[in-house]
Amino acid sequence: MSSTKDVADHHLKAFLAGDLDETLKDYAEGSVFISPNGIAHGRDEIHAVFNRLFAGLFAPGTYTFTVDMEHCEGDVAYTLWLAECADAGIVLGTDTVVIRDGAIMTQTVALKLAPKG
């Protein structure tokens, strides 16, 4: 079984590579993804979320991403991050994941956009 840190690290690496299939490997069928845009239930809906992200704001090769802080405690991993994207800066981003049996069961995301121009 993978540790919380192992799964969180794999998830970040897959996300930064823009690898949709590898990113989705971290989720269980019953996973929930919660963001300011709503709640996605299960792999199919989470697939759609990441497909939009990789086609838009986080299109591979179009942004820089900086991890400011990471904490793992038990089955919870927290990441504080910043990004500079083509159309906006993200001055504050956070992800919290709850990992059980080697898979992300729940993920929350929050971010503060600073539009360019």
Give residue spans per PLM region.
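Short, surface-exposed coil-to-beta transition loops
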Residues: 63-65, 89-95
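Short acidic/polar mixed-charge low-complexity motifs
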Residues: 39, 87-91, 103
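Short, low-complexity N-terminal intrinsically disordered segments enriched in polar/charged residues
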Residues: 1-29
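Short beta-strand edge/turn micro-motifs at domain boundaries
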Residues: 92-117
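Residue-level signal for tight coil/turn positions that link beta-strands
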Residues: 73-76, 101
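Short beta-strand segments that buttress and anchor functional surface loops
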Residues: 78-86
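A solvent-exposed, acidic/Ser-Thr-rich amphipathic alpha-helical stretch
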Residues: 20-22, 28-73
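Terminal "cap-and-tail" regions of soluble proteins that handle hydrophobic small molecules
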Residues: 2-7, 13, 43, 47, ...
